[in-house]
Amino acid sequence: MINPTTITNYDRNQRELEEFLMFCIMVAGKSAKQTAQKLNLFLSKRENNESPLEYVDALLHEELGINLEQAMRNVRLGQYGRLKKAFAGILRFQGHLHEVSVEDLESINGIGPKTARFYLLHSRQNVRHAVLDTHILKWLKLHGENAPKSTPTGKKYAMLEQAFLTYAWKYEMNPADLDLHIWKQYSQK
C-alpha cells in the first residue's frame, strides 16, 4: 500500500511501480491518504497474484466477470472516464516503468505534467523535476515567485519548475526531499 508520508522510494519493483503510477494518476485533486486507501481497496480484489496492471488488463477485457468501470465504481474511485483512459493507456508501459520519460507519460490521456513529474520524482534517484501542485505553488509564491493558484502549463510551468529546482539547490536538498517536505508542511494545514 502507498504511504503518502513516505512517498519517495527509489527501490520499487515493477509491481510497486505499477501501483505507484496508478496512485499518481488517481491523487490529482484529492486527499493522498484517502486515495491510497481507495487504491488499496481496489487492488485488494485481485486474484491469482496479478500485478496491478495485469488486473487492470483483465478488467478491461472483462475476464473476471466484471469490467474496469464497474470495479472502480464498487470502491468509489471517482473520475471514472479519466481513470479508465489513463489506466488503459499505461498498459503499454507494463514491464518498462523504470524507463518511461515525462514525454512518454504525458502521451497518455489523463496524465499531465504534474502527474508525470510526480511519478518520476518519487520513483527515480537524481531526477530534476518539480511537481507544481497547490502546495508547491503556495510555497513558491511565499518565496517571491509569481506563481498562480493552479498548476500552469507550457513556458510558465517550465519557469516555475526551474525556480523550484534553484531553491532545492540553494537549500542543498534533492527535489524529491524538498517536494515532500513542503507537501507535509502544507497538507497539515
Go through the PLM ranges and name each one:
Residues 1-69:
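Structure-specific DNA junction-binding interface
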Residues 25, 29-30, 42, 46, ...:
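Generic structural signal for hydrophobic core residues of well-folded globular domains
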